[in-house]
């Protein structure tokens, strides 16, 4: 039978209409959890992005996503608003009314008539005063001067959204009007100031959440930040938000409902995971670009290899890389190179390239699993006691224990550190001319390598980033301390772990930024390499034809057969090993060209005795003409490329990875770095990092994969 508050009084349905007596085929929710993991990770990321960009977040208690939390936290109230489900009002009111009725009947209930935690043996009939004291003693945070000890406003906004969502489910005993007030604060971009530290996320995030309650109740020590960054008093905050009726006098249980939840930890975890999912996909695509510029062998993505390993994250990572590399102009060129000279490089690529799917796959699985765990948490009812109107009772439990947050954040941080470790290994190969298959040391792009040290500083910075990231990978959750007179003797440290994971994400963005700019530099160096090699070949061929074809009397000369071997050497020699001074006798070009001519002369037999048929006699003339012509031709080719008129276009434009290159070079205007320019690497890295932090990299990243059908290429 339904009472006037919309609650079933003789069944097991609360005011929100949830019937827990109904039989279900999945009573333990393992099926729901498994179903949430179906489909590809990339499709899930695309869905996240689409949801992130919606202008309205509609809260009903059970459908909140990490994308919506990230949107509210990042967009500061501009372009996105929160709406509360009117259907939830009855359930919220029913639980609030139940608490008041219970209090009036003299029913003993934790946090309503009792003290808190280890001192819950104390009793009082002053329910409102008890809630007021709860907020007072929990306001134990330290802010100091400045904002160093204040929780970032984005994380506070996330916490506010998550807490509203929890309380909307009607099990907490709080008035709907309080939830509407918090919503107005969000929509008007008025953010309470919460302490950065001071919570162990069990019983919930008591200390930081008490400052939201402090603002709602008008505590004089409460502060908020307005839309323009101005510090507001509670009175100013209420006025600006349009909250009418003055400060709230908390009714029994309402203070506890506001503070006894995991919203701060899970809110920040949601923000972190939104970015972690994007960065995981970026790592997959950048690994494929790394294979392109390193002239890697694409067979490392072959589906059979990964099918036999069985791990879905690995299979998807390999399929994504395979898609990027399929038809790549770099892969085609590399295949020709390997066929021409199979001994020029090792039979197998190094682990950072060849095992990148095996390395990234488990990290993606961990991040995806953590995402689902946090998504369940932000839709959970996590305070205590829970008000079960249907059974006319308050249930004392421990849903405030934020273990899912602490564990998922520890695991996510470990995955982020592993992604960073791979990125560092790849970057280290990229800048090292002993490993990078012909690219210049440090990716130096200028004419004079003695005055151009390219990405050397960036490599040092990457080592620093990676070291700090590996340190952060250490778990937080094994540092639990017994708290609150040994009542809270195990606790989750959820927010601490979320904060450390947020730091890890920032560092991974620094590494991703540096690596992406390095990859773009390598792409342009391959373009330069191709143009310069073509110029050298054409010049050597031209001089060979002019000098080596004919004898002094116009007859065909034996040296005419040298040209093919001369050009074969030019093909095989790394261009950046000599191009800064191509005709230097100490560099390999002139040495190998002379060696080739000498070898032909030694095979020329008795012809060498005749001045008219001697190949030895041609060497000096050949070298002199080459010295006169080649430096000019090389400089001309460089100048043409720098002016945007290269003889050979950039292969990247034919590749699926082009959108990321285009984003860096054209949309952000990041320069090709050389020692000849004034611009430092850090100035350019900053632009990419800022854009990445704003989410501007998402569209070009997804554009690289827009034609992927979600499956690996068939095994033929």
UniProtKB/Swiss-Prot annotation:
InterPro entries per the UniProt record, alphabetical: Aromatic_Lyase, Fumarase/histidase_N, L-Aspartase-like, Phe/His_NH3-lyase_AS, Phe_NH3-lyase, Phe_NH3-lyase_shielding_dom_sf
Modified residues (2,3-didehydroalanine (Ser)): 203
Location of cross-link 5-imidazolinone (Ala-Gly): 202-204
Enzyme class, broadest EC rank: lyase
Keyword Hydrolase: no
Post-translational modification summary for this protein: Contains an active site 4-methylidene-imidazol-5-one (MIO), which is formed autocatalytically by cyclization and dehydration of residues Ala-Ser-Gly.
GO process annotations (BP): cinnamic acid biosynthetic process; L-phenylalanine catabolic process
Sequence positions that bind (E)-cinnamate: 260, 348, 354, 384, 456, 484, 487
Pathway linked to the protein: Phenylpropanoid metabolism; trans-cinnamate biosynthesis; trans-cinnamate from L-phenylalanine: step 1/1
Subcellular localization, as worded in the UniProt entry: Cytoplasm
Record: active site: 110 (proton donor/acceptor)
SUPFAM superfamilies attached to this UniProt entry: L-aspartase-like
UniProt subunit comment: Homotetramer.
Role this protein plays: This is a key enzyme of plant metabolism catalyzing the first reaction in the biosynthesis from L-phenylalanine of a wide variety of natural products based on the phenylpropane skeleton.
Family statement: Belongs to the PAL/histidase family.
Name of the featured protein: Phenylalanine ammonia-lyase 2
Source species: Petroselinum crispum (Parsley)
């Amino acid at each position: 039978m339904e009472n006037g508050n919309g609650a079933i009084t003789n069944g097991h349905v609360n005011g929100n209409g949830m019937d827990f007596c109904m039989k279900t085929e999945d009573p333990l929710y393992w099926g729901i959890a498994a179903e949430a993991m179906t489909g590809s990770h990339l499709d899930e990321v695309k869905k996240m992005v689409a949801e992130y960009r919606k202008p309205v977040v509609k809260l009903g208690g059970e459908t909140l996503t990490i994308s919506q939390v990230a949107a509210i936290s990042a967009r500061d109230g501009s372009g996105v608003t929160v709406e509360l489900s009117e259907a939830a009002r009855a359930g919220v009111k029913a639980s609030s009314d139940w608490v008041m009725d219970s209090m009036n009947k003299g029913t003993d209930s934790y946090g309503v008539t009792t003290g808190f935690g280890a001192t819950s043996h104390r009793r009082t009939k002053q329910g409102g005063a008890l809630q007021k004291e709860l907020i007072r003693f929990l306001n134990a945070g330290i802010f100091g001067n400045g904002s160093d000890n204040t929780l970032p406003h984005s994380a506070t906004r996330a916490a506010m959204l998550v807490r509203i969502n929890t309380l909307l489910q009607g099990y907490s005993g709080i008035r709907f009007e309080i939830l509407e007030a918090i919503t107005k604060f969000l929509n008007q971009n008025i953010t309470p100031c919460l302490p950065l530290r001071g919570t162990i996320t069990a019983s919930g995030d008591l200390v930081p959440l008490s400052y939201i309650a402090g603002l709602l109740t008008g505590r004089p020590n409460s502060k908020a930040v307005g839309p323009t960054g101005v510090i507001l008093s509670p009175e100013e905050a209420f006025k600006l938000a349009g909250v009418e009726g003055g400060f709230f006098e908390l009714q029994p249980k309402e203070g506890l409902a506001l503070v006894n939840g995991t919203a701060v930890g899970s809110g920040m975890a949601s923000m972190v995971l939104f970015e972690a999912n994007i960065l995981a996909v970026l790592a997959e695509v950048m690994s494929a670009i790394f294979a392109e510029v390193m002239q890697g062998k694409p067979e490392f993505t072959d589906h059979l290899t990964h099918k036999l390993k069985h791990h879905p994250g690995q299979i998807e990572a390999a399929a994504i890389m395979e898609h990027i590399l399929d038809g790549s102009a770099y892969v085609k060129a590399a295949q020709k190179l390997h066929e021409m000279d199979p001994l020029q490089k090792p039979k197998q690529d190094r682990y950072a390239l060849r095992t990148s799917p095996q390395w990234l796959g488990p990290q993606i699985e961990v991040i995806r699993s953590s995402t689902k765990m946090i998504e369940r948490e932000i839709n959970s009812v996590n305070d205590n006691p829970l008000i079960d109107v249907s059974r006319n009772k308050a249930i004392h439990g421990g849903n405030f224990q934020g273990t899912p947050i602490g564990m998922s954040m520890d695991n996510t941080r470990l995955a982020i550190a592993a992604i960073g470790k791979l990125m560092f290994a790849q970057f280290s190969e990229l800048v090292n001319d002993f490993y990078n298959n012909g690219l210049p040391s440090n990716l130096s792009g200028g004419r004079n390598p003695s005055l151009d040290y390219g990405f050397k500083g960036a490599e040092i910075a990457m080592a620093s980033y990676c070291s700090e990231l590996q340190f952060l990978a250490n778990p937080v959750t094994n540092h639990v301390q017994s708290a609150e007179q040994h009542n809270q003797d195990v606790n989750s440290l959820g927010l601490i772990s979320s904060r450390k994971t947020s730091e890890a994400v920032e560092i991974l963005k620094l590494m991703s930024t540096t690596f992406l700019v390095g990859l773009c530099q390598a792409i342009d160096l391959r373009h330069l390499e191709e143009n310069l090699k073509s110029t050298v070949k054409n010049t050597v061929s031209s001089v060979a034809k002019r000098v080596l074809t004919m004898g002094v009397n116009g007859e065909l000369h034996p040296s005419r057969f040298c040209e093919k071997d001369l050009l074969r050497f030019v093909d095989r020699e790394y261009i950046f090993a000599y191009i800064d001074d191509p005709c230097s006798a100490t560099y390999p070009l002139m040495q190998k060209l002379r060696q080739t001519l000498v070898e032909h002369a030694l095979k020329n037999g008795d012809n060498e005795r005749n001045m008219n048929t001697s190949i030895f006699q041609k060497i000096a003339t050949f070298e002199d003409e080459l010295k006169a012509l080649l430096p000019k031709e090389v400089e001309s080719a460089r100048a043409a490329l720098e002016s945007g008129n290269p003889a050979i276009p950039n292969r990247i434009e034919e590749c699926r990875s082009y959108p990321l290159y285009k984003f860096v070079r054209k949309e952000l205007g990041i320069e090709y770095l050389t020692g000849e320019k004034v611009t430092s690497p850090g100035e350019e890295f900053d632009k990419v990092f800022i854009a990445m932090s704003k989410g501007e990299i998402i569209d070009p990243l997804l554009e690289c994969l827009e034609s992927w059908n979600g499956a690996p290429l068939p095994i033929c």
